[in-house]
Amino acid sequence: MNLSLSGRKIAMTRVSAETQYITPIGSPTLDELLKDCDSFRKGDSGDGVKSDDPAHHIIDVEALYVKPVPYVLNFNNLQYDVTLRRRFGFSRQNGVKTLLDDVSGEASDGDILAVLGASGAGKSTLIDALAGRVAEGSLRGSVTLNGEKVLQSRLLKVISAYVMQDDLLFPMLTVKETLMFASEFRLPRSLSKSKKMERVEALIDQLGLRNAANTVIGDEGHRGVSGGERRRVSIGIDIIHDPIVLFLDEPTSGLDSTNAFMVVQVLKRIAQSGSIVIMSIHQPSARIVELLDRLIILSRGKSVFNGSPASLPGFFSDFGRPIPEKENISEFALDLVRELEGSNEGTKALVDFNEKWQQNKISLIQSAPQTNKLDQDRSLSLKEAINASVSRGKLVSGSSRSNPTSMETVSSYANPSLFETFILAKRYMKNWIRMPELVGTRIATVMVTGCLLATVYWKLDHTPRGAQERLTLFAFVVPTMFYCCLDNVPVFIQERYIFLRETTHNAYRTSSYVISHSLVSLPQLLAPSLVFSAITFWTVGLSGGLEGFVFYCLLIYASFWSGSSVVTFISGVVPNIMLCYMVSITYLAYCLLLSGFYVNRDRIPFYWTWFHYISILKYPYEAVLINEFDDPSRCFVRGVQVFDSTLLGGVSDSGKVKLLETLSKSLRTKITESTCLRTGSDLLAQQGITQLSKWDCLWITFASGLFFRILFYFALLFGSRNKRT
């Protein structure tokens, strides 16, 4: 694009939605540029005159150069203390650690406020405090936007975004797909899909991701975008709705100098479009410092400098430690702070000097004459400023340019719950389909397990031994279905952090996520269930025919569903892979012990009976037993077979016949070699299974999966607030 200023005209050549445009302070928003450029591409110059050359147009700057709506974020006297918990009973009393100590500052639209400091200085803590990620009551002080308190405000979540330090993205989605799904979540449903796509395309160019637009994000096992591109995608997700305030926790961490500079360049363009950008950064290069507008340097929670980078040399010169020429001013400042922290007096002298320096600066500002125009601009209320921003194209979630309603009616979420559920399910399925190794691994696991069982339990007969082997088969099959679901642990742990990032600022509802996650998991379990059932049912020789096979398939499917729900719930409560594995395996082991196989229900101590009835393995185990043995025509002990597995088992067949005749005379009941002495119903009674039908057990198994999904919802709702305490 060729830009040349002549009076108030700009010559634009080959304008397109994909053109990168670095806007000056006071420039139009990206949405406005798209609309204006689109009209010029159609040949309308803006004054009703059609141009003959579609590749060259004259744009009136007055139509584009809109004065930005002023926003000022003030934070005063922020104090944040945490109580150090005792690790052991014999340790000393609880102590208190101060993470933020009387920190104040200001951030304006069009500017980047960078928080600097060594590790542990309080950078991330300050960003979290300003973003409302500190639990209510833990933070003292005030945070206001245009004079109105926004700390712990619902409105702050709607108009702001928070970019975490870790780039947590779905690995098998492309850059464009990732941003498009973000637009579906954060932009109102009233906005057409074509408009959302325009926003995504323009954002791709703004982020410098055009060459990587169709490349998958990637992970350890899949080649994808570079680290710098990945970081820019993370930023793009959170600025898709054009937030008024953007918080970033060390966005340049882990990047080389070139990629770090490119990221801050992107942030500069975002700020110049009318947003407040506040970020923490560890040690910026000289090039990055030139892009920053304001600096706050922290030392152990205290502010040792607050001002523009240009005033930093004068500040330290007045302090008596002038910055040498050609020295990186930020590196010098941070090195000096570290030096003072290691001294006996610490940074107290620098903190006191900063307070006096700030007071002198405030006095100079107050004594300087200000125009009424500036005072009028800065006196806009927050609601007026937000409505004005929406009117001029700021894409605030829950609002639209055509209907900039008052902020009381702005929804916390951009879309209804049903739409969120559909988009979440669509995204999950697209990512899952592109990872066939996960599907293949589970199917391969159940195939190998099924084949192993088929060879070990091939064509069981109807003898006492066959009955016992059926019991051991089912005692192995049912818990195996649950243990196979443990492969969900690492997948969901990763998704959990994506969920936290996206719901921190109301991308979608927790209920929408849980419902979509549950619905998508159902078809994933179908193939493993059918494969395992088909292999084991016919080869082992289970009873029931086609009807029995269908029920067996449903039961295996229900067991997979229940096991998946249990593992998902535990993953939501225990966000650590190794601990989650340990808790899941231990819980399933307890359920197996008290399911009724190892210890008969009548033998379970009365104080553990309650666990027997809530064991998730009890009901599928009983269901499969009923499906196999609840047939009065099937006999498992006939005539002389009654002596098998006893001391008389070694007697000859003729001897057993004589013993049977003697027993028949004693009991005065005719017992022959073909007389059925134990049916399947007798085996069920021996196992203590007489209370429920097999269909009751099946529905209870399905219901247990639903119950754990509900628990999973509450675990995310109350246990994943992602706030400091």
From Swiss-Prot:
Gene3D superfamilies: P-loop containing nucleotide triphosphate hydrolases
Transmembrane segments: 438-458, 473-493, 515-535, 537-557, 577-597, 606-626, 698-718
Keywords tagged on the record: ATP-binding, Membrane, Nucleotide-binding, Transmembrane, Transmembrane helix, Transport, Vacuole
GO CC entries: vacuolar lumen; vacuolar membrane
Endpoints of the signal sequence: none
GO biological process: vacuolar transport
Principal place of residence: membrane
Biological function: Confers selective resistance to kanamycin.
Name recorded for this polypeptide: ABC transporter G family member 19
Species assigned in the record: Arabidopsis thaliana (Mouse-ear cress)
